[in-house]
């Protein structure tokens, strides 16, 4: 057992955690495996062994993030830089918290962790040493330590010896805030951040993704202020060093489409883009497993083995997993260290500048084409719009596809105004000569989802350049350039109008969607730059 390794109870006292006699510091995977399966554990702490060798855990009622319970301390550090929920036209989850309420929440979490046996994991967020965050995670739950060990970048022994945390994450999942009503908060649960103290507090929710996305929100604050793009995207690189990034909200295909046997994976969800190129923030992947099959997604299926951690899946008595069962949540997940995928960039998850930028959308209306090539203005317009259908279960209370607009394909994680991310991305794209594409992985007039097979063929055509050489026609109303044919893709589906019984049916739905786009983009028209982009959007 790697206990302490120089980490003392006195260091934890500096954070307000007292009477800690047993610190399990940066535990090995073997130790975590034993701890998670300890028969004396009860409730959500206890894991179950599956036939694939991975441990499965349940996260209770919190099977997704709780954006309504997210708060940021408003003080001199953040007052003039953060994109606040209570200011401006755009809606977001960055609700302000007073320093006094923060102290109260911190007291709740530190009391919860005091006197306990604690797991402490030191890890990096960001593959570039110049801009990475050194993060210390503190929890009393073994599988939560396992989750962050999977998802963040694991330091070498030398790096651990000199590790000085830039950020502290204290996970008090077992405690709640009984005074939430008097404090004007959303509920007894909380996910709170303090940029002055460089700390995140979690209370009431067991969902592991709060730690992952919490640090993403912090990178989204720190990097763009240095001129570095911070992106909710997956990324991979071809044999010739050509880099592609895939933007998209949860469930649109970021992980599936970037995990490609012909290309090496840089990462599946969070990246930066600086003067050297594209780099991963993470050391693992967090894949959706609902309806997972070995045939359709062999790389992800084969990554589910010892050291992977499954969340909220149904495990039968014999240890087999029913991946089709979404009764707990549609947002069933697995986290695994990135090296569980064979074809990855080594030893560091980074590569050169991106030349292909792909916006993934899952259009529940069945209006948008499976692929279109964007102009420079359309690139900014669709990046700021961030349209998709919210897919079942990534957030609590959402089970059917509903249309949503999420700025920069990740509004929930943005800490600055969306236009700041668009400006940085455009600068990086222009310098690299990158081209953007809009790819619909959602539905069409048949009422069925566009097949993974067709989407993969579309991605191949983008990456090998054949789409850029294809003849195109323009889809009315949305003004999108669509190829007339692509190798390996059913030509009938390229024009979405052809998938309907009559063109009028498409027209009717298209008008509905166009109006939603126009109404949503109104929030950007309070600046001249935003107003200038309106022409790149749909026209009624």
UniProtKB/Swiss-Prot annotation:
- Tell me where in or outside the cell this protein is found: Cytoplasm
The protein's UniProt keywords, in alphabetical order, are: Acetylation, ATP-binding, Cytoplasm, Decarboxylase, Gluconeogenesis, Lyase, Manganese, Metal-binding, Nucleotide-binding
Q: Which NCBIfam families match?
A: pckA, PRK09344.1-1, PRK09344.1-2, PRK09344.1-3
Annotated residues for binding of substrate = 65, 207, 213, 333
Q: Which reaction does it catalyse?
A: oxaloacetate + ATP = phosphoenolpyruvate + ADP + CO2
Q: How is the cofactor bound?
A: Binds 1 Mn(2+) ion per subunit.
Binding positions (Mn(2+)): 213, 232, 269
Which Pfam families does the entry mention?
PEPCK_ATP
Top enzyme category: lyase
Its family remark reads:
Belongs to the phosphoenolpyruvate carboxykinase (ATP) family.
Question: Where are the N6-acetyllysine modifications?
Answer: 87, 523
Instruction: Please give the organism.
Output: Shigella flexneri serotype 5b (strain 8401)
The record's GO CC annotations read: cytosol
Identify the CDD domains for this entry.
PEPCK_ATP
One Gene Ontology MF term: phosphoenolpyruvate carboxykinase (ATP) activity
State the protein's purpose: Involved in the gluconeogenesis. Catalyzes the conversion of oxaloacetate (OAA) to phosphoenolpyruvate (PEP) through direct phosphoryl transfer between the nucleoside triphosphate and OAA.
> EC annotation?
4.1.1.49
Q: Which residues bind ATP?
A: 213, 232, 248-256, 297, 333, 449-450, 455
Where does this chain mainly localize?
Answer: cytoplasm
Stored InterPro entries: PEP_carboxykinase_ATP, PEP_carboxykinase_C, PEP_carboxykinase_N, PEPCK_ATP_CS
**Assembly with partners or alone:** Monomer.
What is the name of this protein? Phosphoenolpyruvate carboxykinase (ATP)
* GO biological process, any: gluconeogenesis
